[in-house]
């Protein structure tokens, strides 16, 4: 029985800028919302959160001032370019416990095999922030949380054959790893306004927040199979010659 740490996902990275950006993430929300009727916009992921926190708002009247029923175009009263920063924190690991067995037949054939049980856990938290100067909106933040965990199983087999003392022939087989994984995702958006009176909705905006539903999904994953073979020829005290191939 052996235990192996296959991967370590612990990391933290991001960026921070002390100069104004060329655009805002609000520009993306406006583009993404274009053509989507207002009665469907709340279900549009992050753009739906932007709608719920008043970062984007429907254009409710046409050029002649007539009301539009269920509008599908949007604008924003937030102008100018913001300071921007982002931070990503990742945690987790992948490991494997292997149960193996080997046998020797007359020092001619050596066989080994094992069953590997893998476990995987991964968490990612992304935080993106914008800060505006002299705007109705002071700051906006977006937090996205992703959690993945699951287990997997694989098989491996190795064979060495010695037809004569100075020749070794080898074969190895690594099965795919079959994973069963569970994933959870949610996002939260917070917009902090400077007590801005939004006439269209007759509301004074302060701290506005919105949260997506918790999205849960279960799925399977299979990694590639690996097969290999090789031969080694021993040349006495002069060394050896070896050749291997994997596919």
Question: What label would you give each PLM region?
Answer:
Residues 2-247:
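Outer-membrane beta-barrel porins/channels
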């Amino acid at each position: 029985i052996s235990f192996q740490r296959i991967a370590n996902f612990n990391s933290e990275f991001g960026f921070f800028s002390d100069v104004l950006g060329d655009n805002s993430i609000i520009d993306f929300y406006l583009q993404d919302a274009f053509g989507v009727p207002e009665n469907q916009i709340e279900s549009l992921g992050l753009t739906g959160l932007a709608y719920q926190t008043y970062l984007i708002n429907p254009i409710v009247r046409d050029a002649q001032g007539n009301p539009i029923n269920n509008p599908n175009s949007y604008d924003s009263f937030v102008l100018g370019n913001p300071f921007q920063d982002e931070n990503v924190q990742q945690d987790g690991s992948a490991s494997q416990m292997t149960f193996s067995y080997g046998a020797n037949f007359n020092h001619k054939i050596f066989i080994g095999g094992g069953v590997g049980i893998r476990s995987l856990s991964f968490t990612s938290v992304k935080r993106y922030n914008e800060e505006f100067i002299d705007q109705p909106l002071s700051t906006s933040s977006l937090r996205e949380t992703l959690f993945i965990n699951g287990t997997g199983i694989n098989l491996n087999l190795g064979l060495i054959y010695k037809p004569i003392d100075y020749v070794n022939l080898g074969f190895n087989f690594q099965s795919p790893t079959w994973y069963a994984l569970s994933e959870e995702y949610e996002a939260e958006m917070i917009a902090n306004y400077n007590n801005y009176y939004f006439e269209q909705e007759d509301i004074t905006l302060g701290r506005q927040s919105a949260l997506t539903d918790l999205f849960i999904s279960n799925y399977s994953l299979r990694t590639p199979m690996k097969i290999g073979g090789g031969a080694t020829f021993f040349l006495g005290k002069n060394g050896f010659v070896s050749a291997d191939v994997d596919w």
